[in-house]
Every structure is written in C-alpha cells, then in structure tokens.
C-alpha cells in the first residue's frame, strides 16, 4: 500500500508551489523556528480528506484496524479527547443516562455537559495507604446496571494513568447482558497489542469501542489517537458524524503521517523493538526493586484493590513511609538529575516507559532513584499523613449542564461549603475531577484542595488559578444562591 508519510516526504521535496493554506507556504524562511513546513499541507489532490476518507487516509486507517484486529479505526488529531467525545455522543442519546467510572478523564465529563447526560458513577477500588486507584469490578457494574435500567452505555478507564487494568472480559459480559455497549478509554494502552509482556487490549476482550492515544506510549506525535470500533453494537455512521464534529476541519497531515509511520515501523520492526524494550524495562524494574525506601510499585502491592492486571511500563515510585512526598521526589529528579517524570501525586511519582526509551535512559533513572533512596529517611507509621486523594461519594444536587449554565457567584473555599459547585476541579495530570459541577461542596473537598496546594500539586479547572475561590451555582428561580443546610 502507498504510505502517507512517504508520499508527504516526497511531496515536500517537490517543486509544486502552494497557493493554498497554510500560510507558511512550505517555506522555512517564513518562520523564526525550524518546523517541518515542507510537509505541512492541506487537503490537496492525491492526499485524501480525513472527514471523507476514500484514498490514502482510508487505507491508513484500515491498516491500523488490521494491526489491532478491530472492525474499523478512526484517526484523531485531537487526541483521545475528541475520540471520547465522539464515542459518548454516538452511544447515548441527548439527555440520556450513562454509567461512567468516577476516575474517567475530564473529556468524558465534558461529553456529559455537551450532551446534557445524566451520569451514574461506579467507583474504583483504592489503596488508601499508597493513594492509588484500583480497578472497577464487574460486580459493581452489574449492581449499578440493575439499579439503573435506563443506562444506555458504560464507560470505564483501563488501564488507568497508574497502569491498573480492570477485568474487561467479565465487565463486557455483564454490560452485554443488558444489551448496551462498553466503551473503554484505553488511552494509555496502545502498546498492549505488541508484546505479551503487557496486558491484553480491551479490543480483544469484548469492548465495543476502544480509544487509544498513540502519542502516549508509541512512537507517534502528540495529539495522535485512534478510536476503534470493535463490534456491531456500534453505529459507525454516528461515530463518523461526531468525529467530524469534534475534530478540526483542518487536520494536520504531519500528525496523520506520524500515525501512519508509527504503524509502518511497528509492522516492520515492532517485534524486535518491543523485545529490546521489554528486556531493558524488566532489567530496570529488577534493579529498582532493590531500593529500600523509595518503593517501585508492583501489582502484588495492590491486591484487594480490584486490580485484574498491571501495566509494567508504568514506573510508580512510592514515597509512603519516607521523609519526602511525591512532589519532592519529582522535583529532585528534575532539578538534580534532569529527569522529567510524567506525574506527581501526594504519595508517589510516576514515570512512563515506552518503546522509544534507551538503555542509557533507564540507567539514568535507576541511578537517580538509587541515589535519592540512599539519602531518604524512613519515618514511623504514626507520623505518616493519613489524608489521601479518595474519590469521595459527592452528593449531586444539579446536573452538570444545569450547574455550568446557571447564574454563578464566587465564594472563598470555606464560604462555599454546602453550596453547589459550578466548576470542575481536578489534579492535572491526570485530569480526573475531584469535584464536578452540580455536586455539593464539602469540607473534605476544601481540605483536600488546601492540602494539594500546600504540597505543590497542580489543581486545575477552577477559574481562580490560585484556588482560593470557587464559583457556585444559583439554585432558585430568582437566580440567588440557596444555601444548603448540609455542611461538614
């Protein structure tokens, strides 16, 4: 088949002159930066159109579907965000009800707002000492579906940001008994298909729609993702329609070529690449497991949290029981060793290993963690913070749409207790809300936000970037805020 990235390379070297978008006209001299302008084109003859793919882009998407063993694959240049928005919109009628895992990405909540959906939350298990969310159990999904017969779809995240995988096969069987589709946000699992060292992809276990971010764990550029249709329960026409709505009408050919090149490379060299990657990764993990204070988290440490499988490419370093926290570990790795981690949390720091990593890179990380481990002190259990980022069962008093569209008033965090939030607040990354518009603000929420800020963690979503105030929703016809008597 003709490869998009090769055709783009060839075209970039040609003498065709562009009297069309984009404005740089494939001329490097037009910019102060050295970008790949010669390959940045629009929908010109021979290069197809992502929103009406009939040629080279159709072939590229079909090739990706063949590699992953799915019925149909849609490229997304707006990341997994656009794919999640499209999946939810195509699966649930406007104003309908959906069962979602509470630890879903903020894009899912944005879909709830845009489609005025009514969420039913299923909560993950959690390890409170380590501060890590576990999996979603099929039993919980079954219970919520029995209690909410009008649910039109189920959406869960697996693997989580931390690498926790739920039992997708069993969950899919439960969901299908109720005659509805299962959507799996597998943004962090695009690499599963390429090595038995990793868990099995949801696309092979009965999920109906699977979303993957190529850019997270495969050699592809930022913003590149795919939506896989895996069963006949999915209305492909609706998926196509909503992908066209939520994606830009000017998709980047550089990004699409990046996805095509990624698939081509893995088809040709993937087995050898992943063989070397998993060898170096496992060697590093065995070395890191010898540290005595900074603990590399393994699946065996998360038993009892609903975990079914674990993605070992996620390098979680627990600081529980030590004199430092996750933020401090993150800062030490960055400032002293010039190692940038993916995320920091209260009690751990997270690094993502991927097929592009080198043996030298793993060695640098191991050496840095060993050095920090040697100088870190253990502290008595009684001195450990007992607070954790728990997904507390928040009381929903308004729908997300009602709260976000209502008249709003700003209060200090302490004054807002008992009122209805009109804003999201979440730790980013990973972008999982700790409060959702329409939910009642509690004292625990306020204490959590204060604690996160004190520890240097990044609280986003609030319009007040200092996180000192929050917008609340008016709840009566006059538009004035009604104080709720419930306080903590």
Predicted regions and their residues:
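Short glycine-rich or small-residue beta-strand-to-loop segments that form or flank ligand, phosphate
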Residues: 74-76, 154-157, 316, 350-354
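Conserved C-terminal alpha-helix-loop-beta "cap" of PLP-dependent enzymes
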Residues: 283-461
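Short, compositionally biased
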Residues: 116, 121, 454-465
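Conserved PLP-enzyme active-site core in the AAT-like
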Residues: 4-9, 31, 67-70, 80-300
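N-terminal glycine-rich, Lys/His-bearing helix-loop that initiates the first secondary-structure elements
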Residues: 1-38, 426, 430, 462-463, ...
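Short, glycine-/Ser/Thr-/acidic-enriched flexible segments
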Residues: 26, 161, 216-217, 232-234, ...
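Conserved N-terminal alpha-helix of the aminotransferase class I/II PLP-enzyme fold
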Residues: 36-79
């Amino acid at each position: 088949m003709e490869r998009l990235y090769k055709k783009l390379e060839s075209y970039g070297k040609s003498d065709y002159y562009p009297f069309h978008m984009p404005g740089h006209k494939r001329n490097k001299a037009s910019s102060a930066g050295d970008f790949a302008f010669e390959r940045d084109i629009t929908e010109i003859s021979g290069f197809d159109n992502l929103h009406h793919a009939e040629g080279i882009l159709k072939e590229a998407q079909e090739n990706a579907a063949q590699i992953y063993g799915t019925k149909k694959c849609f490229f997304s240049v707006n990341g997994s965000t656009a794919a999640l928005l499209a999946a939810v919109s195509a699966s649930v009628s406007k104003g309908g009800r959906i069962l979602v895992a509470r630890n879903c990405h903020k894009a899912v909540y944005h879909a709830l707002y845009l489609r005025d959906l009514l969420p039913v939350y299923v909560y993950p298990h959690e390890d409170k000492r380590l501060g890590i969310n576990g999996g979603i159990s099929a039993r919980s999904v079954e219970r919520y579906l029995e209690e909410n017969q009008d649910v039109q779809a189920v959406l869960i995240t697996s693997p989580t940001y931390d690498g926790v995988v739920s039992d997708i096969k069993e969950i899919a069987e439960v969901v299908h008994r109720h005659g509805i589709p299962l959507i799996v946000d597998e943004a962090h699992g695009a690499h599963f298909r390429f090595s038995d060292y990793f868990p099995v992809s949801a696309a092979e276990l009965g999920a109906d729609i699977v979303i993957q971010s190529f850019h997270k764990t495969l050699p592809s550029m930022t913003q590149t993702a795919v939506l896989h249709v895996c069963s006949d329960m999915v209305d492909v026409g609706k998926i196509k329609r909503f992908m066209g709505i939520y994606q830009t009408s000017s998709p980047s050919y550089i990004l699409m070529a990046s996805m095509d090149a990624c698939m081509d490379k893995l088809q040709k060299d993937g087995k050898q690449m992943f063989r070397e990657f998993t060898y170096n990764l496992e060697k590093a993990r065995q070395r890191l497991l010898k540290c005595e204070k900074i603990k590399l988290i393994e699946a065996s440490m998360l038993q009892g949290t609903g975990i079914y499988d674990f993605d070992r490419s996620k390098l979680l370093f627990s600081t529980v029981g030590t004199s430092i926290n996750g933020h401090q570990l993150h800062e030490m790795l960055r400032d002293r060793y010039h190692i940038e981690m993916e995320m920091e949390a209260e009690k751990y720091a997270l690094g993502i290993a991927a097929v592009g990593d080198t043996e030298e890179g793993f060695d640098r990380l191991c050496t840095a963690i060993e050095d920090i481990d040697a100088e870190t002190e253990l502290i008595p259990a009684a001195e450990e913070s007992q607070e954790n980022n728990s997904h507390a069962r928040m009381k929903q008093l308004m729908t997300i749409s009602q709260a976000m569209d209502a008249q709003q008033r700003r209060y200090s965090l302490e004054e807002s207790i008992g009122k209805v939030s009109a804003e999201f607040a979440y730790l980013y990354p990973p972008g999982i809300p700790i409060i959702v518009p329409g939910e009642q603000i509690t004292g625990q929420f306020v204490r959590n936000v204060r604690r996160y800020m004190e520890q240097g963690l990044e609280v986003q979503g609030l319009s007040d970037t200092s996180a000192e105030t929050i917008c609340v929703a008016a709840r009566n016809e006059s538009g004035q805020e009604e104080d709720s008597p419930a306080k903590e």
